Amino acid sequence: LEQMIHYAEAGGCRRAHLLDYFGEAYPAENCGACDNCLNPRETWDGTLVAQKFLSCVYRIREKSGFGVGVGHVVEVLTGASTERIRKWGHDSLSTYGIGSGHARAEWAAIGRELVRLGLLSQDPERFNILELTPAGRDLLRSRKTVTLTRPVAVAGEEEPEFESKSKRSRS
């Protein structure tokens, strides 16, 4: 299911993504035929939100000694007051509530994109616990720019509001 979500939300060439899944390489960056190549998704500077998300994952692991999934990280970022957050002391983290300006669905989409970008890993054998990858740790130390893809609005849903202006990707 997670891989289907990643496929649906990915901003790159779908042909290349499918071939990669089956162990083949697509020689071009753009097939010119899939929905993403015909209508590239908007991108935006997601550096600040990526740093917040990655920092939250790091601080939860450091405080608790164990990892958690995307949902719990989102709850901490948005300042939710759940029994688990209070029990584990995650309401005392510096990242608690720093993302309250965004909806939970937005944070969940950001978390999934950080996994796709290789900044976080998920272990399906361990309830999809998030772990910082070496690239994610490097990003926290170096403050490199992170470009995220704006999610496509689903019929009947409002389009998410992000804090940075977006620009149309022409890859």
Give the ranges of each region predicted by the language model.
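Accessory DNA-binding and partner-docking regions appended to nucleic-acid-acting proteins
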Residues: 1-3, 11-19, 26-171
